[in-house]
Amino acid sequence: MVVPADTPGLRFVRSQVLSAPHPLGEIAFESCRVPAANRLGEEGKGFALGLKTLDRLRATVGAAACGMAARALAEALAHARTRRQFGKPLGEFQLVQEKLARMATHLTAARLLVYRAAHAADEGAERVTLESAMAKLHATETAQRIVDDAVQVLGGKGVLASSVVDRLYRSVRALRIYEGTSEVQHLVIAGLLLKEDGR
C-alpha cells in the first residue's frame, strides 16, 4: 500500500540513530484507513511482489557497497602515494602493495557481480534472485574488508573521526544487514543451487 504522509492514524514515532549511509525512522499505523486504489499489485500477491522487489534492492545495496569500497581504495592509494615512511613512499612497501592489489581485484569482482545482476534485470528477467543475492553478498563482504584495509593503510589518520575512511568504516557495516543479512544470502544462494532448475 502507498500511504500518504497526511493519512489520519499514520504517526512518525522517532528517528533511529544508526551507522548507515541513510536516515531511518520508525512509524506507527493506528487505525489507518487506506483506499484500495492505493494498493500496489494484486490482492494476495504482496509477499511475492516483496520478494521480487528484494531481487532489485539487493543489487542496489551491492552497488552502494562498491561505491564505498571504491572511495576507500582511492583514499588508500592517495595516502600510499604521498605518505613517506623510512625515506620512501608508503606505496613502495610490498605489504602495502599487496593490500592495494587485493583491494582493487576484489572490488572489480564485486562490481562485475553487481553489473551481472543489473544486466539481468534490465534484460527483463522475471527473477534475478540468484544474481542479486550473489552480488549483495560478495559486494558487501568485500566492501567491509576493503574499507578495513584502507583504515590499516592510512594508519592513525584512518581512525580520526574527521577521516573519510573512518566514516566509511562506520557506514559500510550496515550494508551486510539490511535487505537480508549475509547469512540469509548464503541460504538463498544455496537453496537455489540445490534446486534442479536453479531458480
Question: Positions of the model-derived regions?
Answer:
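Extended, low-aromatic, Leu/Ala- and acidic/polar-enriched alpha-helical coiled-coil segments
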Residues: A63, Q94-A104, A133-K136, E141
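Alpha-helix capping/hinge segments and adjacent helical runs
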Residues: E126, L130-R199
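Conserved catalytic-core motifs characterized by acidic clusters
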Residues: V13, A37-L54, H79-F93, A117, ...
